[in-house]
Amino acid sequence: MENKKIETIKDAQKLVKFFAERNNWKDIPNVDKFDHLHEELIEMSQHLRYKSEEERIKFVKENKEIFTDGIGDLFFGTCRLANQLGVDIEEAFNLVKTEILAKYNHKNPENNLIKKK
């Protein structure tokens, strides 16, 4: 299972569950997993902080591996957290997608972007 390409969110969550069981880790709620995910986000955001839009785009293009690795770590950790909480990620996504798409179905820009001077 470890060398098989993961093609669905459900398969990813199953692989992470298998990984945890193989290592004798309990799937119980763990505050450390929330902290781990927060750290992963901070690590990636630090590369883009205080840069203009143009600088951020350039940095990501030139350093794609940083973000590919970070997103992979974040997703693996999210699967682990979902397992600990007994949440099916696909069900959770489908539960919120319509509401989020409707809520942000407007032309306003995203928040917290550095504005050009």
Question: Predicted regions span which residues?
Answer:
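Flexible "arm" and connector segments at domain edges
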Residues: 1-71, 75-117
